Amino acid sequence: MRLPYSSSKPIPTNNNNNNNNTNNGISINKIPKSHYSYYQTQENNKPQQSQQHPLLQHQQQQQQQQQQQQQQQQQQQQQQQQQQPQQQPQIATITATISISPSINNIIVNNSPIKTPSKKHRSSSKKSPSSSKKLNKVLSCCFVCQSSISNPFIVKETPKANHYFCSIQCFAQASP
């Protein structure tokens, strides 16, 4: 429906930005209220979501299902990671419960040899006062190590039988 206007007069343009009641020079107030309210109710009665093509709806549903499946998989992976114990080596302080035996055959030099008397035919179960002194000296050298279950602390005799070195490198995980 066109609004009547005189063809001899040019259509006024809206050069005044402060006038909020005009649209392209035509005042909104000139539209009859009955028509305006009719258009307004038609706009309000429109459905909120435009109906999509069934193929588009199907694709969107598939995408949503895939996203949900991915989220579920991520949650399951996180739960599995939480359930599995961490298998990274832990740092443990060496304690005096470690027994030193000549049968242990690995050493890493810590730049500080410890001179101790050596007994070649000593069993690991017997502990003499000299072995406890030896243990204390070696422990004073080796302060922190990654401990293992079988050999928390690895030491061997050097070619010179009266020298021991402390080990800082260990090879397995800490015992629980």
Curated annotation (Swiss-Prot):
Cystine residue pairs: none
Start-end of Polar residues biased regions: 1-12, 37-46
Disordered as annotated region, ranges: 1-88, 109-132
Listed Low complexity bias regions: 13-24, 47-88
Origin superkingdom: Eukaryota
Name listed for the protein in its UniProt record: Uncharacterized protein DDB_G0288467
Protein species of origin: Dictyostelium discoideum
